[in-house]
Every structure is written in structure tokens, then in C-alpha cells.
Amino acid sequence: MAIKLEDKKAIVAEVNEAAKVALSAVVADARGVTVSAMTGLRKEAREAGVYVRVVRNTLLKRAVEGTEYSILNDAFKGPTLIAFSNEHPGAAARLFKEFAKGQDKFEIKAAAFDGNFIAANQIDVLATLPTRDEAIARLMSVIQGATSKLARTLAAVRDQKEAAAA
């Protein structure tokens, strides 16, 4: 089925806009995945703030040209499903990783984050990034732990001086 030139330009523009505002991108091969499973993936992606699209490789190469995701060009072989994370850098990687557990034929090809190429076997690095709320919670627990340790140390010094004075 041939796509009209205007439609191709619209697809390239849409994907390019998604790439410009995205925090990370993940590329996968969805060959052999059922339509109902793909529909479920798209629904989960919308809920997670992830833009998912199946695009022809030539159009995809044009769409990411001039963005930090042009490093993914070598991964654009065969049927390509691309996902851009808009709210959290690890959202698309986490979504695809979870989806791949239930789908034998779903294969993650590569990812890109902050201008760096991430191979499929290293996707866990991106998928395990903490969300903003998780990172803040971790930081607060570290700060709270250090503060309470300082308070206990000061109390011990005070008690020691009081015992020495008595």
C-alpha cells in the first residue's frame, strides 16, 4: 500500500516533534505480536506518557535526523516500533521490557538516552532509572539519616561532657 507524499511528510513531522521533546527513545521489533497485544501496549503507553508508533524505516530516519536519536539509525532494520518517553526517561524502556516478558516474539533492538546509544542487552540501565518521586524519596531518606546521625552524635558529646563535669 503506497502512502501519499503529503501523508509521509505528516508522519515525519509528527515523529520529529515527538523526538524533539522526548527524554529517551526505545526501538523494538514487533513482528509476530498479535493486534490485541499491540493495542494493549499502546493503551499502557498512553497511560505512562510514552509516544509509540510503527513507522517505515526510511521515514523514521528522516524524522530523527538532526535530533539526538539519529544514533539509532542502525537499529532501523525490519519492522520498527519506536517509543519516545515524554515524562520519565525510563518509562519507554520499562514499558517495553515488561511487555517483552509476555511476548516471545517482541524484541527490543536498542535505545537512546541523553545522546548515548544503549544496546538491547543494556536496556536494564535505562529501565531501572528511578522516577522523579523515587529519586526525591531516596535523597530525603539519605538527608534524614545524616541529620539524625548528627543529632545522636551531638547528644552523645553533650552526655559525655556532662558525665565528665559531674
UniProtKB/Swiss-Prot annotation:
Gene: rplJ
Chain's role: Forms part of the ribosomal stalk, playing a central role in the interaction of the ribosome with GTP-bound translation factors.
Keyword Protease: no
Protein name per its UniProtKB record: Large ribosomal subunit protein uL10
Recorded superkingdom: Bacteria
NCBIfam families, A to Z: PRK00099.1-1
Assembly with partners or alone: Part of the ribosomal stalk of the 50S ribosomal subunit. The N-terminus interacts with L11 and the large rRNA to form the base of the stalk. The C-terminus forms an elongated spine to which L12 dimers bind in a sequential fashion forming a multimeric L10(L12)X complex.
Similarity comment: Belongs to the universal ribosomal protein uL10 family.
InterPro entries referenced in this protein's UniProt entry, alphabetically: Ribosomal_uL10, Ribosomal_uL10-like_sf, Ribosomal_uL10_bac, Ribosomal_uL10_bac_type, Ribosomal_uL10_CS_bac
Pfam families attached to this UniProt entry: Ribosomal_L10 (PF00466)
Keywords carried by this UniProt record: Ribonucleoprotein, Ribosomal protein, RNA-binding, rRNA-binding
GO biological process: translation
Keyword Amino-acid biosynthesis: no
Gene Ontology CC, one term: large ribosomal subunit
A GO molecular function held by the record: large ribosomal subunit rRNA binding
